Amino acid sequence: MASEFKKKLFWRAVVAEFLAMILFIFISIGSALGFHYPIKSNQTTGAVQDNVKVSLAFGLSIATLAQSVGHISGAHLNPAVTLGLLLSCQISILRAIMYIIAQCVGAIVATVILSGITSSLPDNSLGLNALAPGVNSGQGLGIEIIGTLQLVLCVLATTDRRRRRDLGDSGPLAIGFSVALGHLLAIDYTGCGINPARSFGSSVITHNFQDHWIFWVGPFIGAALAVLIYDFILAPRSSDLTDRVKVWTSGQVEEYDLDADDINSRVEMKPK
């Protein structure tokens, strides 16, 4: 673990997660807040939000950023995805911790920027996730679990090294579609979290943590279930416990060169 900590590529990856998260939150949440602005001078604010447009903004931004920084950090951009890859023994514990910190800080920074740009909006929630009227905490939790499960399942399948020849370069696009699909499912029920860092940034800046636990517990349960389903039922991995522990402590041996800053030894969100 200490060996990975000393490498420049490790810190480049952490910075990549931080910067990409800022862009992701700014683009995606900004697209949702934009519906409150009038397009013409005779229109009033408070237009009906177009769920399809917002879902596509979230999905396409993930697909674009996965292509942009996937070769540097893997472009997780989501603590639930990071947890899933950790439980799947594809990244080290240290990398997972630093990624989640970078993602959360990046989300906060992006939300602060959005807060300044959209300060004239009345009742600006900054994309705060909340349960819709009539949706209880159990139902909201279930929606978040299912939405995240399908996302992490897609990530595990598209980043499976055994499938690289089959997938080509379509991995980021598939993951982007999965994010959009999750929003089409969940946006009317919970505002669609499926990303604890995205939910955390809005809650911190608005000082509103009502039902916030749902947007951490749900995605983490969904991620764990996705790993259980993919790694132990659909596509079992042959690596033994010793190899898995080595990954947790030292990183993915096949993907990371821990003894030299080899520019080619990176894990990618897209197949190589």
Swiss-Prot record:
GO cellular component: ankyrin-1 complex; apical plasma membrane; basal plasma membrane; basolateral plasma membrane; brush border; brush border membrane; cytoplasm; nuclear membrane
Residues bearing carbohydrate: N42
Intramembrane: 71-84, 190-202
Entry keywords, A to Z: Cell membrane, Glycoprotein, Membrane, Phosphoprotein, Repeat, Transmembrane, Transmembrane helix, Transport
Tissue: Detected in fetal kidney (at protein level). Detected in fetal kidney.
Biological processes per GO annotation: ammonium transmembrane transport; carbon dioxide transmembrane transport; carbon dioxide transport; cell volume homeostasis; cellular homeostasis; cellular hyperosmotic response; cellular response to cAMP; cellular response to copper ion
Topological type in the membrane: Multi-pass membrane protein
Keyword NADP: no
Bilayer-spanning residue ranges: 12-29, 49-67, 93-111, 136-155, 167-184, 210-227
Subcellular location: Cell membrane
Chain positions found as Phosphotyrosine: Y256
Ranges spanned by the short sequence motif NPA 2, renumbered to the chain: 195-197
Gene3D superfamilies in the record: Glycerol uptake facilitator protein
GO molecular function terms attached to this record: ammonium channel activity; carbon dioxide transmembrane transporter activity; glycerol transmembrane transporter activity; intracellularly cGMP-activated cation channel activity; nitric oxide transmembrane transporter activity; potassium channel activity; transmembrane transporter activity; water channel activity
UniProt-listed InterPro entries: Aquaporin-like, Aquaporin_1, Aquaporin_transptr, MIP, MIP_CS
Cytoplasmic side: 1-11, 68-70, 85-92, 156-166, 228-272
Motif (NPA 1): 78-80
First-listed, main subcellular location of the protein, grouped into a coarse class: membrane
Keyword Chaperone: no
Quaternary structure and partners: Homotetramer; each monomer provides an independent water pore. Component of the ankyrin-1 complex in the erythrocyte, composed of ANK1, RHCE, RHAG, SLC4A1, EPB42, GYPA, GYPB and AQP1. Interacts with EPHB2; involved in endolymph production in the inner ear. Identified in a complex with STOM. Interacts (via the N-terminal) with ANK1 (via ANK 1-5 repeats). Interacts (via the C-terminal) with EPB42.
Purpose: Forms a water channel that facilitates the transport of water across cell membranes, playing a crucial role in water homeostasis in various tissues. Could also be permeable to small solutes including hydrogen peroxide, glycerol and gases such as amonnia (NH3), nitric oxide (NO) and carbon dioxide (CO2). Recruited to the ankyrin-1 complex, a multiprotein complex of the erythrocyte membrane, it could be part of a CO2 metabolon, linking facilitated diffusion of CO2 across the membrane, anion exchange of Cl(-)/HCO3(-) and interconversion of dissolved CO2 and carbonic acid in the cytosol.
Family per record: Belongs to the MIP/aquaporin (TC 1.A.8) family.
Protein name: Aquaporin-1
